[in-house]
A protein has these predicted regions:
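N-terminal polyanion-binding entry modules of DNA glycosylases/AP lyases
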Residues: 1-82
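Non-catalytic, well-ordered alpha-helical scaffold segments
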Residues: 29-33, 54, 86-93, 139
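Short helix-capping/linker segments at secondary-structure and domain boundaries
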Residues: 42-48, 99-107, 146-150
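Short amphipathic alpha-helical surface patches that mediate protein-protein
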Residues: 54-55, 97, 143-146
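Generic structural signal for hydrophobic residues
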Residues: 56, 122, 137-138
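Alpha-helical ds-nucleic-acid-binding substructure associated with the helix-hairpin-helix region
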Residues: 59-129
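Phosphate-backbone recognition surface of nucleic-acid-processing proteins
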Residues: 123-127, 131, 140-152
Length: 152
């Protein structure tokens, strides 16, 4: 069964073969929110992230690209409900700025992602363009947005 939220996925429990890719986001805002979730989740339990997600969404300006791209990490860290990890918060701001650049170049993030032929190439590009994204995070993100790193 396809899923919307990453924590619904058995992939998160290392059972990759039993989980279909997630649903493709409808908006760039959703693409950024899912990337942010994958980054914020690293090192935390899914249960904790699931419980805290409404607070994180509010603290991080609903992951609206323009607002987050113009925020400062210091200001976000002071907001109620924000995760208190300065490196992750700085990555959220930098990644929103990168989304802005990609949208200026390609119109939408989805259109940009479609220009990358293979899932493996997409994984590499995500690691190069975005902060706090390593191989596992890139692979998991692609899975969550409906694309497999194993696509030809």
């Amino acid at each position: 069964m396809s899923h919307r939220a990453p924590w619904e996925c058995t992939f998160a429990k290392e059972e990759r073969s039993r989980c279909l890719p997630g649903k493709k986001p409808r908006t760039d805002h959703e693409y950024l929110e899912i990337l942010s979730l994958c980054i914020l989740q690293a090192g935390l339990s899914w249960a904790s992230v699931r419980r805290s997600w409404p607070r994180y969404r509010t603290a991080f300006l609903n992951f609206e690209i323009a607002k987050l791209a113009h925020a400062t990490p210091a200001a976000l860290l002071r907001r109620p409900g924000a995760l208190r990890n300065p490196k992750k918060v700085a990555a959220l701001v930098a990644n929103a700025q990168e989304f802005d650049r990609i949208r200026a170049e390609h119109g939408t993030f989805a259109r940009y992602l479609r220009t990358v032929r293979s899932g493996k190439d997409a994984c590499t590009i995500l690691q190069q363009r975005f902060r706090h994204v390593g191989p596992y995070t890139a692979e998991f993100y692609l899975h969550c947005v409906g694309r497999s790193v194993y696509d030809p």
